[in-house]
Amino acid sequence: MARVKGGLGAKKRHNRTLKLAKGYRGARSKQYRVAKQSVMRALTSSYAGRKERKRQFRQLWIARINAAARLNGLSYSQFMHGLKLANVDLNRKVLADMAVTDAAGFAKLVEVAKSKLA
């Protein structure tokens, strides 16, 4: 009985994996078995990276807000608490953008937070 090697389906599967592995060094981009492992690991890492990116941006926003708030005489936690008491519903992304691009507007927000804390 003749050996069945997988035919067109296997070829398509191999080509799909090798296409994803394009740009990898050495056997990782040439040999299917090695490429499959590398691609699997890369896809796992990219999935985790998409989750991690959200955490990293939140950390960045908090660091920027903290730095700008301290320039105006408040810590990050006091500033956020003051905004909450003043019913100011701006998220951290917007606050961080304000801290970088609109220092005067951010200073007014700090004054609002200070007035509610006092």
Swiss-Prot record:
GO cellular component entries: ribonucleoprotein complex; ribosome
Keyword Ribosomal protein: yes
Cited Pfam families: Ribosomal_L20
GO MF term list: rRNA binding; structural constituent of ribosome
Underlying gene: rplT
SUPFAM superfamilies: Ribosomal protein L20
InterPro entries: Ribosomal_bL20, RIBOSOMAL_L20_CS, Ribosomal_protein_bL20_C
Role description: Binds directly to 23S ribosomal RNA and is necessary for the in vitro assembly process of the 50S ribosomal subunit. It is not involved in the protein synthesizing functions of that subunit.
The keyword Glycosyltransferase appears for this protein: no
Organism: Agathobacter rectalis (strain ATCC 33656 / DSM 3377 / JCM 17463 / KCTC 5835 / VPI 0990)
PANTHER family: 39S RIBOSOMAL PROTEIN L20
This protein's name: Large ribosomal subunit protein bL20
GO terms under biological process: ribosomal large subunit assembly; translation
Keyword list, A-Z: Ribonucleoprotein, Ribosomal protein, RNA-binding, rRNA-binding
Entry similarity comment: Belongs to the bacterial ribosomal protein bL20 family.
